[in-house]
């Protein structure tokens, strides 16, 4: 079957395959977090040292595609890769757990602060007190998500050799 072009990816019979080459760890992380939040995507992250061709990077990412929705499989394709792939995948597994336990109210609250609102602005937008906003963020695991996001960013940056 020949794929039909659809902009970001290729669509095959009953299966979507979206591929994106990103130049930095933060862009990759933001994309993965959006897909994890949705919960319906099997995600593959291929990390190379940047010395290979675009085709090699695409092949690495394709090999990394997970088999289950809400899962991130990671392959680090470089000379000195040790446990980096497993560490990154474990970080995403923990963050996915936090994201999937969120209530509607928790998703609403975290979405506003993720977009740059402070807690007071987000509370006003939702029509709740700042104390209620703080409680929603705590119940939603916002501090854990922030810590996990920073950890994932650090690990991906190191694995890509960008922090060296």
Q: Where are these predicted regions, by residue range?
A:
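Single conserved hydrophobic/aromatic residue that forms the stacking wall/gate
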Residues: 2-12
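Compact structured core domains
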Residues: 23-98
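Short, Lys/Arg-enriched anionic-surface-contact patches
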Residues: 84-107, 153-161
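Short alpha-helical "packing" element that flanks the helix-turn-helix/winged-helix DNA-binding module
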Residues: 106-113, 122
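Short alpha-helical "recognition helix" segments of helix-turn-helix
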Residues: 119-126
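Key DNA-contacting residues within the recognition helix of helix-turn-helix
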Residues: 134-135
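Short, Lys/Arg-enriched C-terminal cap helix and immediately downstream tail that follows
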Residues: 141-156
């Amino acid at each position: 079957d020949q794929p039909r072009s659809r902009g970001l990816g290729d669509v095959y019979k009953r299966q979507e395959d979206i591929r994106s080459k990103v130049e930095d760890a933060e862009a990759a992380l933001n994309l993965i977090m959006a897909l994890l939040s949705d919960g319906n995507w099997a995600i593959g992250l291929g990390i190379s040292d940047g010395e290979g061709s675009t085709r090699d990077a695409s092949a690495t990412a394709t090999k990394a595609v997970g088999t289950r929705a809400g899962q991130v499989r990671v392959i680090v394709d470089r000379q000195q890769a040790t446990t980096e792939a497993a560490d990154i995948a474990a970080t995403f597994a923990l963050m996915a757990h936090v994201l999937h336990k969120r209530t509607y109210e928790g998703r609403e609250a975290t979405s506003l602060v993720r977009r740059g609102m402070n807690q007071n602005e987000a509370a006003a937008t939702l029509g709740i007190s700042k104390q209620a906003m703080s409680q929603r963020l705590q119940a939603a695991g916002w501090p854990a998500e922030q810590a996990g996001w920073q950890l994932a960013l650090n690990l991906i940056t190191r694995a890509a050799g960008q922090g060296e």
